[in-house]
Regions:
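Fe(II)/2-oxoglutarate oxygenase catalytic core
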Residues: 2-248, 252-281
Length: 281
């Protein structure tokens, strides 16, 4: 018998999990394994009105893998990072504007870290208008290619950079901004990610700068076309937040972005990230 009661939200990505209480997620190892299996099948899991407190959120994530502590210090609970445009709550809020574009977390690490396995967000305060989080399957993006496209794209490699993602929201950066962006190393990844499971996905999104060996404009046009095909309305689940909602997604197989909202709105999400254990290859 399944440990999770799941209702599909769209045919392509997303499912709602009902009937759980926070203590179950925080303490039940078998439930953690069931969540990972459900993520593989659905990409995104929504726990409506769960009201998972920060300590329990970190405990839950420990049942899925190793918790990322690289951003500790922004919140009183280690492993929690406040996602907000309010600089009084997050000194690095300016960088979060890039999350309004489709992306996969972890394509431009500071070192050799792998992309994150999963990300959890819990809603503390929500915007009155906008601020949804949208998801699209990067596995689905690959599966929907023609055989000829799969063969051609399998040979391509793409350079990803922090500068590429930041220029989308700050097209005329100051010298200081450029210096900070370029201090982060660029990373070259295959366009097609062959996962340990045998599944394949496309590595797309805001950090994808150019295709190696292609004319820059032609390469960027190809990346834009693939992203547009992957994120048409029928392939997207948009989560409209309510206070107390918790959402987890498979970062390795799902593109995501935040819908724009008024920066004066007190939108606040608490994020915990589960570290990855699989390189893009």
């Amino acid at each position: 018998m399944s440990l999770l009661t799941i209702n599909k939200l769209t045919p392509s990505v997303g499912a709602e999990v009902v009937g759980l209480v926070p203590d179950q997620l925080a303490t039940d190892d078998a439930l953690g394994a069931a969540v990972l299996d459900a993520l593989e099948d659905n990409g995104v899991l929504v726990f409506p009105a769960l009201h998972l407190d920060p300590v329990a959120q970190v405990q839950f994530c420990r049942r899925l893998g190793e918790v990322d502590h690289s951003s500790d210090g922004h919140h009183g609970v280690a492993g929690i990072y406040p996602v907000t445009l309010d600089k009084s709550k997050n000194a690095s809020a300016a960088y979060l504007r890039a999350t309004f574009d489709w992306h996969i977390d972890g394509c431009t690490p500071t070192g050799g870290e792998y992309p994150q396995k999963a990300t959890v967000l819990s809603a503390v305060a929500v915007a009155r208008r906008g601020g949804e989080t949208e998801f699209a399957s990067s596995y689905g993006a690959y599966d929907q290619l023609t055989d000829d496209e799969k063969e051609r794209l399998a040979r391509l490699r793409v350079v990803h950079s922090l500068e590429a993602s930041q220029r989308r929201v700050t097209p005329d950066p100051t010298p200081g901004e450029l210096e900070r962006w370029r201090a982060r190393p660029t990373h070259e990844h295959p366009l097609v990610w062959t996962h340990a499971s045998g599944r394949r996905s496309l590595v797309l999104g805001a950090s994808a700068d150019y295709v190696v060996g292609m004319d820059p404009d032609e390469g960027r046009a190809l990346l834009a076309e693939l992203l547009a095909r992957a994120t048409t309305g029928d392939k997207v689940y948009a989560h409209s937040w309510s206070v107390g909602d918790t959402v987890i997604w498979d970062n390795r197989g799902v593109l995501h972005r935040a819908a724009p909202y008024d920066e004066t709105e007190p939108r606040l999400m608490l994020r915990t990230t589960v570290l990855g254990d699989e390189p893009i290859q």
